């Protein structure tokens, strides 16, 4: 994928997910008074006459409504909807099915653009019923998926993902098949299914055209983030470290490149510094923010495990130096993760030595079998109680 701007290949940015990101930023205490973010968001609201969205925005962010602005936008909405209704009425009286469908689509797109969620959903569903061409039906489903992502409506996203899959199986083209993977991957990030997100994103790195969701740099950044937490080291090397498309973009993303390569090259103190930067970025990202604590914790465990795999034992001082932290910090971290069963090692407090005690594969399989057997037994017992009732 070349780096030049190819946004014309994407679908319309309607709704524009950048608006959802700006709204999220303004909900954070540290950005609540950020004039630049507020100005950018309000410029989008005014430019698109987003009266319904503006009312909901003021309510959620506890803003004072600008009554004059709201009335002006409502008037613009009424005038445009009247014009669109007249065009639809004319098409129904004088034109064919294709023109009727186009008029219905224009109204649905306008309702979507101004932030009238329920009105847009109703209009798109009516248009869908009037649409025969498979490609056009899929484009409507992509609209519904974008609305779902914009408002983070889980039910809307899951229902329309299944609908899109079904339509693609009927004969969807290559471009729409790949586009759906990006939509699914983005939703997987939102619900913390990083493994599935990595698989979907890596499948579409070389074919990405979903600029209606994000630019290519953001897509590559997300791909690196989810791949690092989801992939084993050999897969990370083959699919990311050696990925030509990813490497090309990483030249213009030095912080992301350092984050990726510092872990792979075992430069742990640099990795910890990069992880701290990633943590701050994730806090400000509307998709990653709910998961940043989990992500950072898992990546620390990942780094500790990677170092420990190379040794039978090593001193706490060596580990602390490797990660660029104090001995007390590393002692507390390891103790916490060992107690939780996340690290296979033990700490000799007297000699300040960390000794690895990785379970062999047969022992691990035995423990897994026992665990799964207990779960199955519990489910059978619950089922038998229900049946007996």
Swiss-Prot record:
<dbReference type="InterPro" id="IPR036390">
    <property type="entry name" value="WH_DNA-bd_sf"/>
</dbReference>
<dbReference type="Pfam" id="PF10602">
    <property type="entry name" value="RPN7"/>
</dbReference>
<dbReference type="InterPro" id="IPR011990">
    <property type="entry name" value="TPR-like_helical_dom_sf"/>
</dbReference>
<comment type="subunit">
    <text>Component of the 19S proteasome regulatory particle complex. The 26S proteasome consists of a 20S core particle (CP) and two 19S regulatory subunits (RP). The regulatory particle is made of a lid composed of 9 subunits including PSMD6, a base containing 6 ATPases and few additional components.</text>
</comment>
<dbReference type="InterPro" id="IPR019585">
    <property type="entry name" value="Rpn7/CSN1"/>
</dbReference>
<dbReference type="InterPro" id="IPR000717">
    <property type="entry name" value="PCI_dom"/>
</dbReference>
<dbReference type="InterPro" id="IPR049549">
    <property type="entry name" value="RPN7_PSMD6_C"/>
</dbReference>
<dbReference type="InterPro" id="IPR045135">
    <property type="entry name" value="Rpn7_N"/>
</dbReference>
<protein>
    <recommendedName>
        <fullName>26S proteasome non-ATPase regulatory subunit 6</fullName>
    </recommendedName>
</protein>
<dbReference type="GO" id="GO:0005838">
    <property type="term" value="C:proteasome regulatory particle"/>
</dbReference>
<keyword id="KW-0647">Proteasome</keyword>
<dbReference type="GO" id="GO:0022624">
    <property type="term" value="C:proteasome accessory complex"/>
</dbReference>
<feature type="domain" description="PCI">
    <location>
        <begin position="193"/>
        <end position="361"/>
    </location>
</feature>
<dbReference type="Pfam" id="PF01399">
    <property type="entry name" value="PCI"/>
</dbReference>
<dbReference type="GO" id="GO:0005654">
    <property type="term" value="C:nucleoplasm"/>
</dbReference>
<dbReference type="GO" id="GO:0000502">
    <property type="term" value="C:proteasome complex"/>
</dbReference>
<comment type="similarity">
    <text>Belongs to the proteasome subunit S10 family.</text>
</comment>
<dbReference type="GO" id="GO:1904813">
    <property type="term" value="C:ficolin-1-rich granule lumen"/>
</dbReference>
<comment type="function">
    <text>Component of the 26S proteasome, a multiprotein complex involved in the ATP-dependent degradation of ubiquitinated proteins. This complex plays a key role in the maintenance of protein homeostasis by removing misfolded or damaged proteins, which could impair cellular functions, and by removing proteins whose functions are no longer required. Therefore, the proteasome participates in numerous cellular processes, including cell cycle progression, apoptosis, or DNA damage repair.</text>
</comment>
<dbReference type="GO" id="GO:0005829">
    <property type="term" value="C:cytosol"/>
</dbReference>
<dbReference type="GO" id="GO:0043161">
    <property type="term" value="P:proteasome-mediated ubiquitin-dependent protein catabolic process"/>
</dbReference>
<dbReference type="Pfam" id="PF21154">
    <property type="entry name" value="RPN7_PSMD6_C"/>
</dbReference>
<dbReference type="GO" id="GO:0005576">
    <property type="term" value="C:extracellular region"/>
</dbReference>
<dbReference type="GO" id="GO:0034774">
    <property type="term" value="C:secretory granule lumen"/>
</dbReference>
